[in-house]
Amino acid sequence: MRGGVAPERALPIAAEETRDPGALEVAARVAAGAPIAEAIAAQGKPEWRVLAAAWGLAERSGAPLAQALAGIAAALRELTRLRQQRTVLLSGPRATVRMVATLPPLALVLGGLLGFDPLPVLLSSVGAALLCAGAVLLGAGVGWARSLARSVESDDRIAGLEFELAWIALRGGAAPAEALVRVADCVDEFGAEWVGFDCFRAGAPLRTALATALRVGVPVGPLLLEEAEAVRARARAELESEAERLGVRVLVPLGVCVLPSFIALGVLPVLLSMLGGL
């Protein structure tokens, strides 16, 4: 589009180049006559709806579409970086859970190798009770630990998008108050849930940044982009802190459930086998 290609033509070209299934579906809808922003929003995923809101906002406000999409694309790439960073940060707690979960069966194997066969004990009524209790505790502990990890994974969003969208509206020549209205309308129309409506209330960071720029007399656009990057930097720092806290919290299910399971499945059967052989 920066080279002068019309959006209706640029979209299928980009879809063919990338061979992305989502982009191909959007191009097919546009070819069937759907408006581009609506075709993008029909993909249903949050990142597509954000892109649809940015596209529709640029079209309606008269902002340069190529620049608007470049800014949103840079913001959306942050999602990939966050997912990669989160995978790395959570690898430690996940490895801890997997390692500790293997201890009970390993203890049984080790006891057998040492000559204390725990199988007769496990086949007795006492052993059956130990097996049931240990299995329940082990399953509960692993499930609990995994749920803690999923709670960190569930916050899958990009922060600061309201600043990017407001910048697009302002690039179209709208006054700050009108720009906020246009952004809110597009967010509502295309269902961009990563941009909450509380972002537009009085005292919110977006309104504070606009008021500061107008009061001091600095250019609004660069200030909004700087604020967007600052918000995303804080989100990255929060992700790191949350992953560090997870490394501590995951010790609770390991201590409350997995350790007793290790005793029930790995220690007591071997100990009873030893005592029975005396």
Regions found by a protein language model. Name each.
Residues M1-P93, V152, R157-V252:
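Catalytic metal-binding core of the metallo-beta-lactamase
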Residues L148:
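Residue-level signature of catalytic and energy-coupling elements of molecular machines
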Residues Q85-V142, E240-L278:
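Bilayer-spanning, highly hydrophobic alpha-helical transmembrane segments
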